[in-house]
């Protein structure tokens, strides 16, 4: 049966009619339907939940004549199951009982109070604390794309206007949203195939006028001029759809979403999707975080600092003034050792950024208030530490931290030291905060003394020494005696419950007291909930200032972390230059040096106007790719304000970093390894400029040697002579080492190896000049190729060398053949039939002439 078919509701029980009506309103997600202590799922939802969560699939009688598939989840364990579902891209509607079962006629009143989707999470238990949790929307116009992202757990709202598919792909790679909304007419689905949380939305949700109205209402402004985004039409349409989706799922006000910013690629170094992937910035090639740049650089004290660091890594700055401000702050923290005390103080702050989002959404829990109180208690000490520092950027951040004495005192008076998890449990509001609450609690808490006194009195009155007075939630207060002694109870004892060996009674006095106590408990809980709600109203007027406090603290954390990393890992402050070039002395790969079991060999690189391209040669496993990547990573680190793993680094203006390193088949798009490689190469050749840093590794593999060599030669020539980009060009085509003889600005460098009998030792040191050979057979032996195969290969090699034979134009001994021989290929001769066909003017031919020409073309072919 289809649970969203509401045409035949009368066939079903009242409870199932209620369920089916709600399911019809939330047909595109799982519906968790609260029944007592369980959330139940029915029909297809039950089958899907059973499959996804590994829970039992049962049946709940019949409704409408058919068995009802059913699966259930205990309410107290729901967060764990929700976490599993959102991790695989599922959305869930939470339907709660809001009516009183005791007074309800028919099904208890229920309501969907919460919709959980991967991109709208704010619950601490469901979020990954050190990763942004982004909801995105994309809209395709006639020319270009609009892209918007929102982190509901922090309120960060960003849009971008993107001209090409490639730039959209790069943004998707950079932001890595957990849920993405797209229009019905979106025409680039191949870019979204690997995202789990995809949501197709109707075209009208992207309407421009509706989007503007939504955003103006959200920000409480008359126009959007103050945000500098009025010309970003496509991305505003995406932002409008995104805003409506969040309103629909959160079902509450969203005061923490109070601004929107525009991401301009011109402000940052452009990193395309391939570059972000190849450099393993925040995610390794296997999809994890181990052995990434972020893993090495991240020793932040707070989760919000960790998230900011990852955003910085993906957005290296181009403005030298902003970079210098960060460097100055880091340098002062390092020289004064202030980073040590700051790290400890910041560690105690907690994740204020996400706590403020939960406060804004009124989903905060008691322990969120306790953590906020702790952070505000620490603020004066943090301010005192910053007062000793003079770097302008640090001073500015200190001012943004703000002061909140009233809020701190309020939370100190209102919240107990160690509050319970949930407000419904009570015991959150501190004694003395509210006199009426204290009075109701006093009645309830005095019950213990009363019951002790009652038990002693009744034992004496009845003479039953084993008599006990107790309480449970089902039957309330009771007087318990053994069955053997039940004949001795007074006449005013009324039987309440019979057990195997016991009888439980209640007296009019105890009944009256029970009603009084339970009434006081209920009133205490109700009043405590009211006071709890009022706390939100008292704190939220300072929401914007508290959000600024969180952002400033996160940035201080990142800068302090940079100082610690520089001290611990031996990094130096890079110098920024206005002249184009990259000069690194004794540079090291930041990740490889941390995981290597042997000392890392530091290497230099020098690129400037008269030395723009380095042809990098050397054996496989010699370290060419590591060398190239370290140049890119050091350059990137310099542009986020971080110190770098080098003795000295001088970095000039950089607009883009490109990498063409490694490749594999793109099965989803039906592209071979060679096609992927050529696509990435084409992107570089089209978009690189004289201020770009380009890494090209092994261009031309996957095709014939003539084709590969020709492509590699032409690409290198184009980059050197037409583009003028700063380029590291690694190759096994030794013929390319003759390029320096033919083109200005091109130089050879190589990574050497030492051969001893049948073994090879890689030196990993970069030296000027070209490599002498490739050591292919030795590397094959190290890789475990059978000795028999290696022996046969050596025999074949000697045969070929003795004949001075070339295989497809490349000397098999690895030495360079004359470039004229290799590239001076004969011009292709046109087929005579094609020449004849090109010369024909069909408009001037008679039928007889046309027939004769057909015979002539047949003969020529």
Curated annotation (Swiss-Prot):
GO annotations of cellular component type: cytosol
Listed GO biological process terms: mismatch repair
Presence of the UniProt keyword DNA-binding in the record: yes
GO function terms (MF aspect): ATP binding; ATP-dependent DNA damage sensor activity; damaged DNA binding; mismatched DNA binding
Keyword DNA-binding recorded: yes
Annotated positions binding ATP: 618-625
InterPro entries assigned: DNA_mismatch_repair_MutS, DNA_mismatch_repair_MutS-lik_N, DNA_mismatch_repair_MutS/MSH, DNA_mismatch_repair_MutS_C, DNA_mismatch_repair_MutS_clamp, DNA_mismatch_repair_MutS_core, DNA_mismatch_repair_MutS_N, DNA_mismatch_repair_MutS_sf
Coiled coil: none
Keyword field: ATP-binding, DNA damage, DNA repair, DNA-binding, Nucleotide-binding
Pfam families per record: MutS_I, MutS_II, MutS_III, MutS_IV, MutS_V
PANTHER family referenced in this protein's UniProt entry, alphabetically: DNA MISMATCH REPAIR PROTEIN MSH1, MITOCHONDRIAL, DNA MISMATCH REPAIR PROTEIN MUTS FAMILY MEMBER
Similarity-based family: Belongs to the DNA mismatch repair MutS family.
Chain's role: This protein is involved in the repair of mismatches in DNA. It is possible that it carries out the mismatch recognition step. This protein has a weak ATPase activity.
Name by which UniProt lists this protein: DNA mismatch repair protein MutS
């Amino acid at each position: 049966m289809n649970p969203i078919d509401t045409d035949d509701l009368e066939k079903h029980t009242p409870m199932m009619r209620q369920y089916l009506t709600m399911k019809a309103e939330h047909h595109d997600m799982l519906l968790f339907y609260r029944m007592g202590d369980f959330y139940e799922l029915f029909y297809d939802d039950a089958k899907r939940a059973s499959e996804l969560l590994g829970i039992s699939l049962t049946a709940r009688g019949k409704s409408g004549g058919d068995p009802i598939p059913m699966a259930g989840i205990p309410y107290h364990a729901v967060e764990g199951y929700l976490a599993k579902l959102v991790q695989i891209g599922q959305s869930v509607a939470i339907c709660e009982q809001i009516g009183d079962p005791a007074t309800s006629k028919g099904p208890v009143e229920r309501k969907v109070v919460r919709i959980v989707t991967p991109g709208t999470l704010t619950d601490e238990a469901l979020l990954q604390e050190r990763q942004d949790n982004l909801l995105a929307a994309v809209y395709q116009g006639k020319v270009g794309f609009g892209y918007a992202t929102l982190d509901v757990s922090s309120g960060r709202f960003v849009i971008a206007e993107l001209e090409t598919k490639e730039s959209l792909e790069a943004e998707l790679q950079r932001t890595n949203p957990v849920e993405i909304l797209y229009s019905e007419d979106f025409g680039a689905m191949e870019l979204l195939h690997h995202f789990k949380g995809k949501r197709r939305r109707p075209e009208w949700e992207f309407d421009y006028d509706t989007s503007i109205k939504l955003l103006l209402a959200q920000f409480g402004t008359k126009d959007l001029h103050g945000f500098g985004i009025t010309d970003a039409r496509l991305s505003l349409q995406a932002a409008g759809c995104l805003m409506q989706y969040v309103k629909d799922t959160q079902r509450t006000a969203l005061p923490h979403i109070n601004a929107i910013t525009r991401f301009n690629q011109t402000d940052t170094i452009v990193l395309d999707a391939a570059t972000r992937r190849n450099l393993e910035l925040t995610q390794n090639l296997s999809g994890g975080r181990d052995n990434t740049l972020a893993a090495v650089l991240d020793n932040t004290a707070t989760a919000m600092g960790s998230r900011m660091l990852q955003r910085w890594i993906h957005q290296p700055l181009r403005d030298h003034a902003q970079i210098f401000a960060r460097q100055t702050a880091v340098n002062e923290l390092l020289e004064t050792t202030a980073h040590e005390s700051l790290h400890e103080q910041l560690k105690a702050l907690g994740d204020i950024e996400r706590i403020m989002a939960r406060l804004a959404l009124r989903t905060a829990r008691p322990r969120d208030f306790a953590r906020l109180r702790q952070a505000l208690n620490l603020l004066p000490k943090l301010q005192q530490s910053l007062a000793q520092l003079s770097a302008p950027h640090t001073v500015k951040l200190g001012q943004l931290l703000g002061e909140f004495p009233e809020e701190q005192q309020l939370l100190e008076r209102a919240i107990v030291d160690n509050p319970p998890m949930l407000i419904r449990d009570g015991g959150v509001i501190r004694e003395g905060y509210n006199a009426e609450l204290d009075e109701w609690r006093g009645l309830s808490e005095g019950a213990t003394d009363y019951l002790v006194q009652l038990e002693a009195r009744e034992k004496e009155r009845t003479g039953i020494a084993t008599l006990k007075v107790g309480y449970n939630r089902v039957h309330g207060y009771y007087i318990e005696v053994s069955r053997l002694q039940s004949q001795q109870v007074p006449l005013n004892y009324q039987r309440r419950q019979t057990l195997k060996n016991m009888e439980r009674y209640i007296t009019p006095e105890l009944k009256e007291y029970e009603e009084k106590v339970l009434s006081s408990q209920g009133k205490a809980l109700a009043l405590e909930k009211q006071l709890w709600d009022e706390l939100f109203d008292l704190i939220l007027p300072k929401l914007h200032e508290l959000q600024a406090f969180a952002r400033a603290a996160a940035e201080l954390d990142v800068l302090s972390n940079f100082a610690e990393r520089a001290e611990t890992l031996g990094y130096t402050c890079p110098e920024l230059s206005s002249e184009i070039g990259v000069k690194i002395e004794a540079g090291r790969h930041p990740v490889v040096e941390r995981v290597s079991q042997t000392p890392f060999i530091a290497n230099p690189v020098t690129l400037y106007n008269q030395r723009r391209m380095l042809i990098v040669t050397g054996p496989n496993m010699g370290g060419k790719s590591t060398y190239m990547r370290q140049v890119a990573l050091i350059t990137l680190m310099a542009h986020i304000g971080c110190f770098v793993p080098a003795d000295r680094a001088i970095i000039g203006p950089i607009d883009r970093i490109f990498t063409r390193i490694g490749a594999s088949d793109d099965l989803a798009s039906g592209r071979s390894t060679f096609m992927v490689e050529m696509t990435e190469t084409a992107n570089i050749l089209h978009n690189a400029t004289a201020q770009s840093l380009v890494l090209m590794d092994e261009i031309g593999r996957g095709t014939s040697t003539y084709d590969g060599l020709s492509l590699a030669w032409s690409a290198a020539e184009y980059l050197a002579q037409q583009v003028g980009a700063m380029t590291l060009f690694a190759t096994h085509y030794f013929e390319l080492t003759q390029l320096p003889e033919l083109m200005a600005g091109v130089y050879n460098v190589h990574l050497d190896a030492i051969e001893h009998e049948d073994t090879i030792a890689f030196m990993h040191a970069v030296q000027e000049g070209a490599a002498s050979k490739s050591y292919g057979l030795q590397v094959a032996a190290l890789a475990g190729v059978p000795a028999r195969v290696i022996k046969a290969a050596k025999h074949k090699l000697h045969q070929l060398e003795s004949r001075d034979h070339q295989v497809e134009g490349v000397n098999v001994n690895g030495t360079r053949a004359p470039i004229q021989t290799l590239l001076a290929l004969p011009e292709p001769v046109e087929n005579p039939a094609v020449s004849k066909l090109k010369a024909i003017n069909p408009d001037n031919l008679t039928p007889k002439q046309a027939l004769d020409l057909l015979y002539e073309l047949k003969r020529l072919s």
